[in-house]
Amino acid sequence: LDWVEEFMREELEPLDLAPLDPYDKQNPHLMAVLRPLQRKVRDKGLWAAHLSPDLGGQGYGQVQLALLNEIVGRSRWAPSVFGSQAPDSGNAEILALFGTDEQKARYLQPLLDGDISSCYSMTEPQGGSDPGLFTTAAVRDGDDWVINGEKWFSSNARYASFFIVMAVTNPEARTHQKMSLFIVPVETPGI
């Protein structure tokens, strides 16, 4: 933790004054600053410490993470530098557990490598985060799904390469069984 303290103080906290957004991974100027910092964190074995080793993380338990997060929580740059930014970390776990091999190659690996950002779209204007009140629906249209509805408070949407969208697919089912998650590339019409 001594190294983390020093790294935060000397390298990351000064960046909080920089005019770059640490979540905009499409910005080449940002990546020129971010990549060397990420390498230092990887070299110390602290990259994505919250994720399991099979996802390239350290599999830290709650106490270890709490001690680390107490320090890294001082800078808005730290989540991008340490590979722990939300919603990317949660989306990585979803993709690792439920994604196809093709989805893992296209979305999970670049996410784990810190090359892209993602977005999780669940909250709705009329229902907040209560899935029992969601109205965004996905219906089959041949081999495709058509999603209709409105999501908001989707963190990092403007920087995301893809969204994971929660939509109602079985409206007659119990609340916890009526939803499905969809990977929606940012270039999809209607986003």
Give residue spans per PLM region:
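Amphipathic, small/basic residue-rich leader segments at the start of a protein or domain
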Residues: 1-86, 97, 102-113, 117, ...
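Short beta-turn/strand-loop junction motif enriched in small, turn-promoting residues
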Residues: 54-56, 123-127, 152-153, 168-172
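FAD-binding core of FAD-dependent oxidoreductases
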Residues: 79-92, 115-121, 150-163, 180
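Short, well-ordered, mixed-charge alpha-helical segments that flank or form enzyme active sites
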Residues: 88, 103-105, 126-131, 154-156, ...
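A structural signal for short hydrophobic beta-strand segments in well-ordered beta-sheet cores
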Residues: 137-139
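Conserved protein kinase catalytic domain
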Residues: 69, 92-95, 108, 164, ...
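A short core secondary-structure module
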Residues: 144, 148-191
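Short acidic, glycine/serine/threonine-rich loops at helix termini
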Residues: 96, 130-134, 157-159, 177
